């Protein structure tokens, strides 16, 4: 089994903090629709090209899909017709068993799998939400970021705080039962009390999943340039701890399981229809992101679209981060990607950076004797400092370890 990621690079405007590859479409409608049509045709053809390549490569036959994720960019910028074509192609290539019920205007898959699409709140109109019913999408990930209109304007977000709440109501009316919302903290001049207010407004929405991150100043972004120019100031370490502690404690009190450094899933609710990737704990939320969990637990995945990454059979590949060049290459039946072989040390380092982010941590039994000895030798002083803990063959971060997780991971890596 493997995950399928499809990158939709289009954004109506660029947020000042975003380091992901994205493009702002042409202002003229005809030009914009032409680029969308060519890009959608290209990602559909890339799926076909990759399937053909895999079927012709000895030992590289891959199994069915366990998750599908449409990310970006802003996938909700696509037309309904484009989204429908993408899913029809997925079904043709990967045989997920789409079942279209035209009478009730719904679509499902023969075997339940998690299918997520990222959306902006202002894209979720009544019509858009109802159109989702006729697609197999069963999970929406929505970027709220903050419930302060002032901070939304600072980020160059196009929506308002009220539109987030309206969008969730529209999704509920369309029978979308699995909604995730992204929230940020650590804005310039943001206080702890303001952060608490954001958390309470989010909890009032009664959603199934929350991703919460500190505001990052990524090199190359407009936000980073503001920081370098001294026009904004990053939050200090003490305020970060207070905000993060508040987040963890309040979400736990509200019935959310923290299963990764930045991700929280509601514990109560329906039984999961999807296979949980890790089974260390008997009690797990049915609303964990199965797609993201596959990254953290070393499950192979295919990335489709400009800048998308793939991992399978000991290889990692990535497509060119240029929409025009990507479209041209695919139209010429070429896969515009580079790849590298993942050696044992790289695989070990990848595991440190991914599995250690999860609440379960690293399953030591999956390591060879050599790497297990190496890891535990480096982990010992960190355990003594209270940053790491071993439980029944799993090595994981403590809460104090989470605060300095980047440093801990760096100390454990093989160089």
Whereabouts are the PLM-identified features?
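Compositionally biased low-complexity segments, especially N-terminal hydrophobic helices
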Residues: 55-58, 106-111
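Short amphipathic alpha-helical interaction segments
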Residues: 370-384
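A short, conserved structural fragment
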Residues: 384-393
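Local cysteine-cluster metal-coordination motifs and their immediate loop/turn environment
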Residues: 9-22
């Amino acid at each position: 089994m493997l995950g399928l990621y499809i990158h939709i690079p289009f954004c109506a405007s660029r947020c000042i903090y975003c380091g992901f590859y994205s493009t702002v479409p042409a202002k003229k409608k005809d030009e914009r629709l032409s680029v969308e049509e060519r890009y959608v045709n290209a990602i559909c053809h890339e799926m076909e090209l990759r399937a053909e390549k895999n079927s012709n490569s000895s030992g590289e036959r891959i199994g069915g899909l366990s998750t599908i994720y449409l990310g970006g960019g802003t996938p909700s910028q696509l037309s309904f017709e484009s989204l429908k074509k993408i899913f029809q192609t997925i079904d043709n290539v990967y045989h997920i068993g789409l079942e279209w019920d035209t009478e009730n205007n719904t679509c499902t898959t023969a075997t339940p799998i998690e299918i997520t699409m990222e959306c902006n709140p202002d894209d979720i109109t009544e019509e858009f939400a109802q159109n989702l019913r006729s697609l197999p999408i069963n999970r929406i990930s929505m970027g709220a970021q903050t419930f302060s209109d002032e901070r939304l304007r600072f980020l160059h977000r196009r929506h308002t705080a009220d539109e987030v709440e309206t969008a969730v109501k529209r999704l509920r009316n369309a029978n979308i039962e699995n909604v995730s919302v992204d929230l940020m903290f650590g804005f310039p001049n943001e206080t702890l009390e303001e952060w608490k207010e954001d958390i309470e407004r989010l909890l009032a929405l009664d959603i199934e999943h929350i991703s919460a991150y500190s505001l990052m100043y990524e090199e190359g972004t407009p936000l980073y340039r503001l920081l370098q120019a001294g026009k904004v100031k990053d939050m200090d370490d003490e305020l970060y701890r207070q905000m993060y502690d508040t987040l963890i404690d309040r979400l736990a009190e509200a019935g959310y399981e923290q299963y990764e450094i930045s991700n929280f899933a509601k514990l109560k609710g329906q039984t999961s229809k999807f296979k949980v990737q890790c089974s260390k704990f008997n009690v797990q939320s049915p609303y964990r992101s199965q797609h993201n969990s596959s990254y953290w637990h070393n499950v192979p995945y295919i990335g489709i679209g400009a800048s998308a990454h793939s991992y399978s059979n000991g290889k990692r590949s990535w497509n060119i981060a240029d929409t025009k060049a990507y479209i041209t290459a695919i139209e010429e039946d070429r896969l515009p990607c580079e790849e590298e072989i993942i050696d044992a040390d790289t695989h070990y380092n990848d595991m440190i950076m991914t599995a250690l982010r999860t609440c379960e941590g690293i399953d030591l039994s999956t390591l060879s004797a050599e790497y297990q000895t190496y890891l535990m030798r480096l982990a010992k002083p960190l355990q003594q400092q209270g940053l790491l803990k071993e439980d029944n063959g799993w090595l994981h971060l403590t809460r104090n370890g989470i605060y300095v997780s980047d440093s801990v991971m760096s100390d454990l890596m093989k160089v």
